[in-house]
Amino acid sequence: MTGAQVKLPPLMTVADFLEWPGDGTKARYELVDGVLRAMAPPNDTHGLIQSNLAIAIGLHLRENRPGCRINITPGVQPRLRADWNFRIPDLGVTCAPNAPGILTMPDPVLLIEVLSPGNANDTWDNVPHYASLPSVVEILIVHSTRMKAELLRRNANGEWPENPEVVDAAGVIHLASIGLDLPLAEVYVQSHLARV
């Protein structure tokens, strides 16, 4: 038996999207150029990597940068076609004051995506949109099928590198935006990749 096809709105602005009550399912969406894009639920490895990052970064921030905080799946409104885009990374760090009731993360400095086979195109499509936010210093892409991370960091002139810095299984992720050196192996603790 198949379920009824859910009819989605044709085009939405960010204001429409933030007021939209949803489609009546538990599906999650982000807004891409005015069109709703469904977000697949994370698999176990994706979720574990996301949790490990949130714990490691959250503890570091609490101890070393008490004015900063990490959020899981924060909404960000890129500068590129700002009225038509509301992207949702896996994790984000901001050092702006807490703004209760605000659905957009204020002034993120670090945005993180966990790359899965099913979301690779969407993830890399989001990168230039994240980079359009003036507050963003670093964008971290962490793979969920192998122990690998790719880090993009804005330079002192405000420019982004053409290619990311690649961190392999034995490497350390240097997150200058929050002053954290995180061994990549810690990101994969308790995952099947840590045992490979």
Name these PLM-found stretches.
Residues M1-V196:
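Gly/Pro/Ser/Thr-rich low-complexity, intrinsically disordered segments predominantly at protein N-termini
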